[in-house]
Swiss-Prot record:
Residues 1-53 form the F-box domain. PANTHER family: F-BOX/RNI SUPERFAMILY PROTEIN-RELATED, FBD-LIKE DOMAIN FAMILY PROTEIN. Pfam families: F-box, FBD, LRR_At5g56370. Gene3D superfamilies: 1.20.1280.50, Ribonuclease Inhibitor. Residues 342-392 form the FBD domain. This is Probable FBD-associated F-box protein At1g32375. SMART domains: FBD. It comes from the Eukaryota. InterPro entries: F-box-like_dom_sf, F-box_AtFBL13-like, F-box_dom, FBD, FBL13/AtMIF1-like, LRR_dom_sf, LRR_FXL15/At3g58940/PEG3-like. SUPFAM superfamilies: F-box domain, L domain-like. It comes from Arabidopsis thaliana.
Length: 422
């Protein structure tokens, strides 16, 4: 302990910032030097699974320790709640106290697995009292109507996971008052009281929108997106609602499109500038506008769980002249009981197979006739192929050996192409 105490104060404070608030406060008994050192820690994590008996209830522990905290700037204030009955009033007091410390990051996580079913309602003061806030992450709580305007002039990162809202309008008000927002994560939950989740943010660079099959019983629910500066898009919707793109996202370089939308033309057509694309959609017909070309696409991943994956693959290969890396993977169980489509070799070899495709990775390869025909077509057409990696779904050693043997015997147009079987 003597050696530890001899370390520079800045280093000790940094070490303490890695601990929970309960453990940080406990260090005050180590020596006179440590008695006040904990008050300077710029990161406080309050986890109510740590019951501080010496301070009574969890709420009282937070009140007393937080009031004594003396750091000029509080980088992070993180609450992990759910095992005790902290209410709106408690959170209101803590947020008000944090305002005095120029709080930069606020995280509030509610764990409902160990508490009753009552929801934690966040106070309205959250909307206006933390003007220096750069990051706000909220999980499993309730936002209420705003009686006054929002004020997040410095907010760059916002995460809303399993949150409930008073309605569509609050979302619009919240996002319209985040003038420098760059990263937005939205993971919707069942009965969140939102029909159309509208994202109109001109400064946004990264957008994650996830909605599970259970997120809503209303088939009319969906998203409206207007983000002209967007660079990364991750949208997953297994419910099959809608997604309206108000303006093309010409700066998107990375996209993950995994949804059950019947119509994807507008969404896919708006990201034609993408360089890295993952796609899992139910239909290849009109998947994107006729004439669209993915001129910048160099890495493509297609999920093979959908019935139409094979036809979709051929379409995207045809319209991606600079593609270098192709990955095929089945990330989900088959989503349709319809017959699998038959393989129809295209009348013309896609340009990327002749001039640019260098690697093929196939994960959970099953060795069906259609899969073997696709593999054979790519191998005999890929002039620039360097490596083909196959990962089998089967655990049968003999079956794996037969697959490897079949693939190894296929004609390879590229003399330098190597086949690896994982």
């Amino acid at each position: 302990m003597d050696k530890l105490s001899q370390l520079p104060e800045a280093l000790l404070v940094r070490i303490l910032s890695l601990l929970s608030a309960k453990d940080v406060v406990s260090t005050m008994v180590l020596s006179k030097r440590w008695q006040f050192l904990w008050m300077l820690v710029p990161k406080l994590i309050y986890d109510d699974s740590y019951q501080a008996i010496e301070y009574g209830s969890f709420s009282r522990f937070v009140d007393r320790s937080f009031t004594l905290h003396d750091a000029q700037v509080l980088d992070t204030l993180h609450f992990k709640l759910g095992k005790t009955s902290c209410g709106t009033g408690d959170i209101r007091v803590w947020i008000k106290t944090a305002e005095k410390s120029c709080l930069r990051e606020l995280i509030i996580e509610i764990d409902k697995s160990n508490s009753d079913n009552s929801s934690v309602v966040l106070p309205r003061s959250l909307y206006t009292c933390c003007r220096m806030l750069v990051t706000l992450k909220l999980n499993n709580a309730v936002l209420v109507d705003a009686t006054s305007s929002f004020s997040f002039p410095s907010l760059k990162t916002l995460s809303l996971v399993s949150m409930k809202f008073p309605g569509d309008e609050l979302i619009k008000m919240l996002l319209s008052n985040c003038p420098v927002l760059e990263d937005l994560v939205v993971k919707r939950c069942p009965y969140d009281n939102v029909t159309t989740f509208t994202v109109r943010v001109s400064s946004l660079k990264c957008l994650v929108l996830h909605e599970t099959e259970l997120a809503s019983i209303n088939a009319d629910c969906g998203f409206v997106i207007d983000t002209p500066s967007l660079e990364c898009l991750d949208i997953e919707d297994g419910r099959g609602g809608f997604c309206v793109i108000e303006n093309n996202m010409t700066k998107v370089v990375k996209a993950n499109v995994c949804n059950s939308y019947v119509h994807t033309q507008q969404l896919m057509g708006s990201i034609s500038s993408v360089k890295r694309l993952y796609v899992c959609i139910p239909s290849s017909k009109d998947a994107y506008p006729v004439g669209s070309v993915f001129h910048c696409l160099v890495r493509l991943t297609i999920c093979t769980c959908e019935t139409e994956w094979l036809n979709l693959l051929m379409c995207v290969l045809r319209d991606s002249p600079k593609l270098r890396e192709l990955k095929l993977v089945k990330n989900h169980v088959y989503r349709s009981h319809q017959p699998r489509p038959c393989w129809n070799e295209p009348s013309a070899v896609p340009e990327c197979l002749l001039t640019s495709l260098e690697t093929l990775e196939w994960v959970k390869y099953e060795g069906t006739e259609e899969e073997k025909e696709v593999a054979a077509f790519i191998l005999r057409s890929g002039s620039c192929l360097k490596k083909v990696t196959i990962s089998s779904k089967s655990t049968d050693i003999n079956k794996k050996f037969e697959m490897l043997k079949e693939l190894s015997l296929l004609f390879r147009r590229s003399p330098t192409c190597q086949i690896a079987f994982d």
